């Protein structure tokens, strides 16, 4: 079980120097903006993302290294924190829907029990409603399993952001 932290702070993932105000303009730099999009994508293996960051740093003239790399950190943070917040919002909606489904299942089960208790109950109707209840319960249980997996996604995004920020920090330290 993880505690809900709606937004990250830069200090949680960046242990380098304070980012200059100009780093906030990362979206206006096409090369930084494109790299942020690439490395933030979870489908790209972390090692490949780290290599892209290293290659980017190696391609920069010395005087552009620090400004561009701090823009990259700010961009990764802004992009991945927004993605993480979006996922958390989706998890919240999903969990709320699960609560509604659970209440509906309890009502459906109670109705089936009442129908079974009637001595003159139509057995075909009892069987049909029992099948519906079993199917709805199976769907509910599969959604519970999915919710468990989906709840890991914000942590996966955080860990990726930390690893990528650490790569930038190490790259900057190596160039000094």
What kind of region is each of these model predictions?
Residues 30, 47, 51, 67, ...:
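Generic alpha-helical secondary structure signal
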Residues 9-11, 15-16, 20, 88, ...:
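A composition-driven signal for long, intrinsically disordered, charge-rich low-complexity tracts
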Residues 124-176:
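Alpha-helical oligomerization segments
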Residues 1-66:
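N-terminal Sec/ER secretory leader and immediately downstream segment
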Residues 85, 89-92, 96, 103, ...:
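Heptad-repeat alpha-helical rod positions in long coiled-coil/spectrin-like domains
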Residues 58-89:
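Short, charge-rich amphipathic alpha-helices with coiled-coil/heptad character
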Residues 80, 87, 94, 98-116:
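Non-transmembrane amphipathic alpha-helical segments
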């Amino acid at each position: 079980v993880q505690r809900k932290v709606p937004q990250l702070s830069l200090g949680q993932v960046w242990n380098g120097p304070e980012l200059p105000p100009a780093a906030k303009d990362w979206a206006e730099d096409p090369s930084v903006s494109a790299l942020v999009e690439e490395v933030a994508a979870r489908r790209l293996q972390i090692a490949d993302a780290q290599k892209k960051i290293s290659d980017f740093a190696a391609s920069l003239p010395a005087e552009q290294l620090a400004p561009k790399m701090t823009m990259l950190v700010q961009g990764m943070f802004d992009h991945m924190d927004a993605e993480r917040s979006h996922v958390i919002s989706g998890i919240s909606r999903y969990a709320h829907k699960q609560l509604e489904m659970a209440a509906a299942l309890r009502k459906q089960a109670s109705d089936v029990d009442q129908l079974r208790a009637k001595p003159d109950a139509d057995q075909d109707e009892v069987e049909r409603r029992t099948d519906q209840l079993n199917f709805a319960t199976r769907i509910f249980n599969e959604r519970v399993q999915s919710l468990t997996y989906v709840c890991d996604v914000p942590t996966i995004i955080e860990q990726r952001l930390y690893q990528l920020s650490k790569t930038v920090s190490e790259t900057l330290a190596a160039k000094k």
